[in-house]
Amino acid sequence: MVEKHLLEFLEKLQFLISKNVKISHYGIENVKKICGVDIAYKGNLGFSVGVSMDINSGDYNYKSYVGEVNFPYIPGFLFMREAPLMIKAIEGLDCHLLLVDGHGIAHPRKSGIATVIGVLLDFPTIGVAKSRLTGDLVNESEITYVYLNGEKVGVKFGRYFYSPGNKVDLQDCIELGKRGYPKVLKIADMLTKKIKKE
């Protein structure tokens, strides 16, 4: 169990991070190398894999990192479980844009794991999540947006939710989502499960 005062402290930290987010258009068409990072668990061990993929050739290389995870799963505080391991797994990888399995600003405090990692590393990130954490879904011009307090913070394509982490914008998320679930995240997911079994 996590003490209330710690969660209140972490909320303040998230609000601070959200104030340092840079929302700007990156241009998915400019990405030559894209990275994806994911994590799998066995007991209290986390198996994180970062993948760097060449957009044109599809060639990729990866790095993995295994570490102990002591923070429980609490919705809205995923970064405490996963960000330390994810950051270790992507160290040294060559890429222009990082896709994180989790939310960006489509988060109650606009500070999901993709935002935390993006701000800490001062790097372009997009969060790609399998479920909605907050906000309302509104269909506009054949696109489903996630609205939070009257602001568009994400988009939904298929069953996945895309939101800016840092140094990208909603249009980047739309362009990414239109292409289908990112191959680099599929590879990262496959590798985490493979490494977990070894």
Swiss-Prot record:
GO terms for biological process: DNA repair. The record marks 73 as: Interaction with target DNA. Its EC number is 3.1.21.7. It comes from Saccharolobus islandicus (strain Y.N.15.51 / Yellowstone #2). The gene is nfi. Belongs to the endonuclease V family. Its cofactor is Mg(2+). It comes from the Archaea. InterPro entries: Endonuclease-V (IPR007581). Mg(2+) binds at residues 38, 101. It is found in: Cytoplasm. It catalyses: Endonucleolytic cleavage at apurinic or apyrimidinic sites to products with a 5'-phosphate. PANTHER family: ENDONUCLEASE V. Keywords: Cytoplasm, DNA damage, DNA repair, Endonuclease, Hydrolase, Magnesium, Metal-binding, Nuclease. GO terms for cellular component: cytoplasm. It is an enzyme of class 3 (hydrolase). This is Endonuclease V. GO terms for molecular function: deoxyribonuclease V activity; magnesium ion binding; RNA endonuclease activity, producing 5'-phosphomonoesters; single-stranded RNA binding.
